[in-house]
Curated annotation (Swiss-Prot):
This is Thymidine kinase. Homotetramer. ATP binds at residues 15-22, 88-91. Zn(2+) binds at residues 145, 148, 183, 186. InterPro entries: P-loop_NTPase (IPR027417), Thymidine_kinase (IPR001267), Thymidine_kinase_CS (IPR020633). It is found in: Cytoplasm. GO terms for biological process: DNA biosynthetic process; thymidine metabolic process. Signal peptide: none annotated. It comes from Macrococcus caseolyticus (strain JCSC5402) (Macrococcoides caseolyticum). It catalyses: thymidine + ATP = dTMP + ADP + H(+). Its EC number is 2.7.1.21. GO terms for molecular function: ATP binding; thymidine kinase activity; zinc ion binding. The keyword Chloroplast does not apply. Belongs to the thymidine kinase family.
Length: 191
């Protein structure tokens, strides 16, 4: 997977909530740090669930991160020599994140992005599908369905324990109190 490239590349880690996306991003970042590579990690300002200045996985692993409001701010922070640029919760960025990641890869960086591939309705969650298309490596992770234990590819949003409706707002930052991993069979989105 980590062949030597003369230019940079993009790695996209995706899947449903609770599938281990942030955990995998943190693992790859730590491997880079162990190899004495220079790493910088970014997260969107909207993601304030666990920490404003860290990427934190659901099981508590964390790595220091720069909090940004707009994808263009990433380019402003990447001024010194870095080897790895990691971006978590990429689905919360504007669609310009695709161009930012592409530009960084073309400048020779290893770019790792992690985010949801589908929203709570089971609809592709832009800009992640486009990032998947331009990535050299795509890792799609699955969680375990909270109803039956089957592999989970969907994220179920719950409002007071009841499935959210299709026309509810797409973005609602939350964790276990609002979302569950579900398989295709047990994913419910009332119209």
């Amino acid at each position: 997977m980590y062949e030597h490239y003369h230019s940079g590349w993009i790695e996209c880690v995706t899947g449903s909530m609770f599938s281990g996306k942030s955990e995998e991003l943190i693992r790859r970042v730590r491997r880079g740090l162990f190899a004495k590579q220079k790493v910088i990690v970014f997260k969107p300002s909207i993601d304030d669930r666990y920490s404003e200045l860290e990427v934190v996985s659901h099981n508590g692993n964390k790595v220091e991160a720069v909090n940004v409001h707009h994808s263009s701010e990433i380019l402003e922070h990447v001024k010194e020599a870095h080897d790895i640029i990691a971006i978590d919760e990429v689905q919360f960025f504007d669609n310009d994140i695709v161009g930012v990641a592409t530009q960084l890869a073309e400048e020779g960086y290893r770019v790792i992005v992690a985010g949801l591939d589908m929203d709570f309705r089971g609809v592709p969650f832009e800009p992640v599908p486009e990032l998947m298309a331009v990535s050299e490596h795509v890792t799609k992770l699955q969680a375990v369905c909270s109803v039956c234990g089957a592999p989970s590819s969907r994220t179920q949003r719950l409002i007071d324990g009841v499935p959210a409706k299709f026309d509810d707002p797409i973005i609602l930052v939350g964790a276990k109190e609002s979302y569950e991993p579900r398989c295709r069979e047990h994913h419910v989105v009332p119209k």
